């Protein structure tokens, strides 16, 4: 079965040109999914979208962020059959391993949601009498998460959940081995109501991973 993936952010942004690549089922050789082959220009575009979304997302309070993360966990679970089918077809995994991935990943998102109210600072001793010195933790900006294929749902979620809880926007660099599985994660977060540009995914053909990934890593 082939699933076609048309997006690399939640806003239905397509690659700059009709470029796609096929991922084949390692057990049967059949096409498992067809995904966008994004290049360096596409990577810069999605990074710009994530940067534009950062001020609004970082200003959102911890309780609204927690509520959205809890909704995302439920959205992941609601897509169980799609996740299992995609992971089995793209990676050749067993059904049990795919379902375990999903169960653990949903729990990780809920744990990340619980962290939103636990992000604190500290009081730092000062040599100046009457001076109160504090260190505060603040979101840093756009976070790039590069997820592998061997536990794709778990590791894809791990790459983005805590950064989101801390007020950062994220780009998930999907593995070329399981682009559909990783894209489903972002679709679930979009369904949960995350604002435009906060959660993004980029995929690339196996022949282009260095160009696309390096382009994202070099962005300011």
Kindly label every feature range from the protein language model.
Residues 121-220:
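Rossmann-like NAD(P) dinucleotide-binding subdomain of oxidoreductase/dehydrogenase enzymes
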């Amino acid at each position: 079965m082939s699933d076609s993936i048309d997006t690399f952010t939640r806003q239905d942004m397509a690659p700059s040109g009709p470029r796609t690549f096929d991922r084949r089922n390692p057990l049967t050789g059949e096409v498992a999914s067809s995904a966008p082959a994004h290049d360096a220009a596409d990577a810069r575009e999605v990074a710009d979208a994530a940067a534009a979304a950062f001020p609004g997302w970082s200003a959102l309070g911890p309780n609204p962020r927690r509520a959205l993360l809890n909704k995302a966990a439920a959205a992941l679970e609601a897509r169980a059959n799609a996740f299992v089918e995609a992971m089995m077809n793209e990676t050749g995994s067993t059904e049990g391993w795919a379902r375990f991935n999903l169960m653990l990943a949903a729990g990780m998102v809920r744990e990340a949601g619980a962290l939103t109210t636990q992000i604190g600072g500290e009081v730092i001793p000062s040599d100046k009498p009457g001076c109160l010195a504090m260190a505060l933790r603040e979101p840093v900006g756009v976070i790039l998460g590069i997820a592998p294929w061997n536990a794709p749902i778990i590791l894809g979620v791990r790459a983005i959940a805590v950064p989101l809880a801390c007020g950062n926007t994220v780009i998930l660099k999907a593995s070329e081995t399981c682009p559909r599985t990783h894209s489903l994660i972002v679709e679930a977060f979009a369904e949960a109501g995350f604002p435009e540009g906060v959660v993004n995914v980029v995929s690339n053909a196996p022949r282009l991973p260095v160009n696309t990934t390096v382009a994202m890593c070099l962005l300011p």
